[in-house]
C-alpha cells in the first residue's frame, strides 16, 4: 500500500474555500495583486461547490443605484430593522455599496439576467432581489477564479490555520488533506483569506430521507468559516445572529419565488389565509 505524501506549497495569498466567496476573493486578489502568487483551496470542486452549487433563480441583493432604486443607506436601515439593532452597520454599508458593481460583472461574464424590455432594468422580484436564469451562476464565477489563480486545489479539506512562528497572533498558512488520496498538504502564505462555508443544519431539519440533502441552505456547510479563525484566536463579530428558515410541507427551496415573484400566499389546514387573518394582531405583537 503506497504511503501518503506530504505536499508543500508557498504563496503570497491563500484563499480557503472555493464557493462564491472564495472564487470571488480569488478574482479580487488578482485584480489588486497582479504579480502575486495566489492559490485557492476547495474541499469539493469549485465548478459546483458552495451554497450556490446548483444555481439560483435570483440574486438576493441589488441596490440599483444607477437607476436610483435604492441606496446603501436604505439597505443598512433594512438590516437594522430586520435584526432589531443587532447589526454592524459599517459592514452592511460596505457590502451594499459594492454589490451593484459585482452584479454588473456577472452580467458581463454571461450570466443570463432577466431584464425589462422597455427600460433595460433588471427584473425585480421584490425590493432587493433581481431575477436570473442561474443554473450557470457558479461555473461562471469559478471560471473567473481559474483564470485568476496560479493554482486551484480541489478536494483538499483545510483543517487548521498555521500560526506564524516569528510574529505573534499572525496566521502564516494552513494545513489540510486530500479527500481522495489522503495526501497531507501544507500551505505557507503571507496572507490567508478564510472564505469557507457557514454552518447549516445546526438544528435537525424537518426534511428527512432524500429531502435531507435538498434543504436550503447547503447541507455541506459545516461551519469551517467560524471554526478555522476561532481556533486561531480571531475575534468574531455578529455571532449572536442566526437564521432559522420557515419552510412548507414538501417544499425544500427558497420561498422568495413563491411570495414575491408568483404573488402566492400560504394557508393553513383549514384553507385559511392565516397571515391576512392575523395581520393586525401580529402587528400589535411586533
Task: Tell what function each PLM region has.
Residues 4-5, 36-37, 42-172, 178, ...:
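Conserved N-terminal/central alpha/beta ligand/cofactor-binding core
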Residues 17, 189, 195-196:
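Short, well-ordered coil/turn residues at beta-beta hairpins
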Residues 8-11, 181-191:
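Core beta-strand elements of the Rossmann-like FAD/NAD(P) dinucleotide-binding domain
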Residues 13-40:
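N-terminal Rossmann-like FAD-binding beta1-loop-alpha1 element of flavoenzymes
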Residues 194-253:
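Glycine-rich loop(s) and the adjacent beta-strand/alpha-helix scaffold that form part
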Amino acid at each position: 500500500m503506497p504511503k501518503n505524501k506530504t505536499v508543500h506549497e508557498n504563496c503570497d495569498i491563500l484563499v480557503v474555500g472555493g464557493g462564491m466567496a472564495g472564487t470571488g476573493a480569488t478574482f479580487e486578489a488578482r485584480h489588486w495583486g497582479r504579480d502575486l502568487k495566489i492559490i485557492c483551496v476547495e474541499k469539493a470542486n469549485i465548478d459546483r461547490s458552495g451554497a450556490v452549487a446548483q444555481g439560483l433563480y435570483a440574486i438576493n441583493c441589488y441596490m440599483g443605484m444607477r437607476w436610483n432604486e435604492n441606496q446603501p443607506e436604505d439597505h443598512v436601515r433594512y438590516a437594522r430593522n430586520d435584526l432589531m439593532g443587532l447589526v454592524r452597520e459599517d459592514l452592511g454599508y460596505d457590502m451594499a455599496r459594492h454589490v451593484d458593481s459585482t452584479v454588473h460583472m456577472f452580467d458581463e461574464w454571461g450570466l443570463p439576467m432577466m431584464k425589462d424590455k422597455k427600460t433595460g432594468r433588471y427584473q425585480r422580484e421584490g425590493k432587493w432581489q433581481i431575477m436570473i436564469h442561474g443554473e450557470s451562476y457558479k461555473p461562471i464565477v469559478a471560471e473567473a477564479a481559474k483564470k485568476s489563480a496560479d493554482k486551484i486545489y480541489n478536494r483538499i479539506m483545510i483543517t487548521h490555520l498555521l500560526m506564524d512562528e516569528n510574529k505573534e497572533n499572525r496566521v502564516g498558512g494552513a494545513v489540510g488533506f486530500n479527500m481522495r488520496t489522503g495526501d497531507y498538504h501544507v500551505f505557507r502564505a503571507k496572507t490567508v483569506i478564510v472564505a469557507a462555508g457557514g454552518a447549516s443544519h445546526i438544528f435537525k431539519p424537518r426534511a428527512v430521507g432524500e429531502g435531507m440533502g435538498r434543504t436550503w441552505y447547503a447541507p455541506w456547510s459545516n461551519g469551517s468559516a467560524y471554526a478555522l479563525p476561532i481556533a486561531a484566536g480571531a475575534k468574531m463579530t455578529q455571532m449572536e445572529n442566526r437564521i432559522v428558515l420557515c419552510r412548507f410541507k414538501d417544499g425544500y427551496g427558497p420561498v422568495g419565488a413563491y411570495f414575491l415573484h408568483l404573488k402566492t400566499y400560504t394557508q393553513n389546514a383549514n384553507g385559511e389565509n392565516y397571515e391576512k387573518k392575523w395581520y393586525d394582531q401580529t402587528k400589535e405583537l411586533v
